[in-house]
């Protein structure tokens, strides 16, 4: 099923020491607060979800939360987990399986792509993904060792007015989101700003309130 992309995209990553019930409760709260696109990202080598079967089991539980709210659900990197869990799509990084190969393996999956430079953004648009991500806007511990692409990269992509939806990602939170929107982003993706907040539902609602409305998110500014 193809679900409409939203404006506030949560990349949900369980901590190594986090009980699954707590993780699921925080994801559910974030969805209730307004997260309208969701990705599950389990890091390679995770002691809990490094193997396919536990990753698939968690993806099915997270996907059920998204499906109940008609929110599009993506799995990071793993085409096999996305297929086995019934996800809407898979998100692929620059070092992951090429989008063309993913389409051959799973023609029905939507595809999201990470980009970190104008050249990568141009290539991403040529591959016709469901969406692509632009960042990291700011340095973030989620991607250690990766230099920030900065607001200049957001402005560059916004000026292109891509036909493909795109999300600004990397260090986006309540202290930075206004600058990211001013640079031209109408959609943002977050990790810690929502999932690590004391109240994920409130954090999501507060971020969503700072984004352009759904109609503006469909047009260039």
Curated annotation (Swiss-Prot):
Covalent S-S links between cysteines: none
Pathway membership: Cofactor biosynthesis; thiamine diphosphate biosynthesis; thiamine phosphate from 4-amino-2-methyl-5-diphosphomethylpyrimidine and 4-methyl-5-(2-phosphoethyl)-thiazole: step 1/1
Keywords, sorted A to Z: Magnesium, Metal-binding, Thiamine biosynthesis, Transferase
Record-linked SUPFAM superfamilies: Thiamin phosphate synthase
Residues involved in Mg(2+) binding: 77, 96
Catalyzed reactions: 2-[(2R,5Z)-2-carboxy-4-methylthiazol-5(2H)-ylidene]ethyl phosphate + 4-amino-2-methyl-5-(diphosphooxymethyl)pyrimidine + 2 H(+) = thiamine phosphate + CO2 + diphosphate; 2-(2-carboxy-4-methylthiazol-5-yl)ethyl phosphate + 4-amino-2-methyl-5-(diphosphooxymethyl)pyrimidine + 2 H(+) = thiamine phosphate + CO2 + diphosphate; 4-methyl-5-(2-phosphooxyethyl)-thiazole + 4-amino-2-methyl-5-(diphosphooxymethyl)pyrimidine + H(+) = thiamine phosphate + diphosphate
Binding site for 2-[(2R,5Z)-2-carboxy-4-methylthiazol-5(2H)-ylidene]ethyl phosphate: 140-142, 171
Entry's EC annotation: 2.5.1.3
Any one Gene Ontology cellular component term annotated for this protein: cytoplasm
Residues where 4-amino-2-methyl-5-(diphosphooxymethyl)pyrimidine binds: 39-43, 76, 114, 143
GO biological process: thiamine biosynthetic process; thiamine diphosphate biosynthetic process
EC top class named in words: transferase
One Pfam entry name: TMP-TENI
Cofactor stoichiometry and binding remark: Binds 1 Mg(2+) ion per subunit.
Top-rank taxon, per record: Bacteria
GO molecular function terms attached to this record: magnesium ion binding; thiamine-phosphate diphosphorylase activity
Cofactors, names only: Mg(2+)
Family: Belongs to the thiamine-phosphate synthase family.
Function per UniProt: Condenses 4-methyl-5-(beta-hydroxyethyl)thiazole monophosphate (THZ-P) and 2-methyl-4-amino-5-hydroxymethyl pyrimidine pyrophosphate (HMP-PP) to form thiamine monophosphate (TMP).
HAMAP family: TMP_synthase (MF_00097)
Protein name: Thiamine-phosphate synthase
Taxonomic classification: Bacteria, Thermotogati, Deinococcota, Deinococci, Deinococcales
Gene from which the chain derives: thiE
């Amino acid at each position: 099923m193809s679900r409409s992309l939203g404006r506030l995209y949560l990349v949900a990553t369980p901590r190594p020491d986090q009980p699954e019930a707590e993780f699921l409760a925080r994801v559910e709260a974030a969805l209730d607060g307004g997260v309208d696109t969701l990705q599950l990202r389990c890091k390679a080598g995770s002691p809990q979800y490094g193997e396919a079967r536990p990753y698939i089991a968690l993806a099915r539980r997270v996907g059920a939360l998204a499906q109940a709210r008609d929110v599009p659900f993506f799995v990071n990197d793993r085409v096999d987990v996305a297929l086995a869990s019934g996800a809407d799509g898979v998100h692929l990084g620059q070092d992951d399986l090429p989008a063309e190969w993913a389409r051959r393996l799973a023609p029905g999956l939507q595809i999201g792509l990470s980009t970190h430079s104008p050249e990568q953004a141009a290539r991403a648009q040529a591959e016709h993904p469901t969406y692509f991500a632009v960042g990291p806007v700011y340095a973030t511990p989620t991607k250690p060792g990766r230099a920030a692409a900065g607001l200049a990269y957001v402005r560059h992509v916004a000026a292109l007015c891509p036909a493909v939806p795109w999300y600004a990602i990397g260090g986006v939170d309540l202290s930075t989101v206004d600058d990211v929107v001013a640079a031209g982003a109408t959609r943002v993706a977050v990790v810690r700003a929502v999932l690590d907040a004391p109240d994920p539902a409130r954090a999501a609602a507060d971020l969503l309130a700072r984004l352009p409305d759904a109609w503006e998110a469909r047009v260039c500014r």
